[in-house]
Amino acid sequence: MRARYLLDTNTVSYIIKGNPPAVRQRLLRVPMAEVGISAVTQAELLFGVARLPTSPKLRVAVDEFLLRVEVLPWDSEAAEQYAGIRFDLEQHGEPMGNLDLMIAAHALALEAALISSDRGFRRVKGLKLEDWTRA
């Protein structure tokens, strides 16, 4: 099954930390087969772990999360979306960080809703965006 919901890095952090609780509660109402993360998000999570080598609890929590969720490869369809989004945003003088652009492009390529509380994603035309931090 293709992911219906793509979790961004901040959303995954909320899930791992358990705060805000609304995010975990919403996740529990969705079949895990419909949830995924981008390989870009996986890279960001692993970078966060590498930055805190003295936090074995964080490493365990991230590893356990990655075992439970499908990590979706960033592919040529996502690359096509990335080019279009980046061009559009730069034309309007509204640049976005490359990793966020890659995650947004991945969600568009998958036709999935991006789960994020980051309002910057609202600038991406056609992106289905859901904020699970609000109950």
Predicted regions, residues:
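Alpha-helix capping/helix-boundary segments
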Residues: 11-12, 41, 78, 103, ...
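Active-site neighborhoods of divalent-metal-dependent phosphate/nucleic-acid chemistry enzymes
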Residues: 3, 70-115
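Generic structural signal for small/hydrophobic residues in well-ordered secondary structure
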Residues: 8-9, 23, 45, 82, ...
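Residues at the C-termini of beta-strands that transition into short coil/loop
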Residues: 39, 75, 118, 133
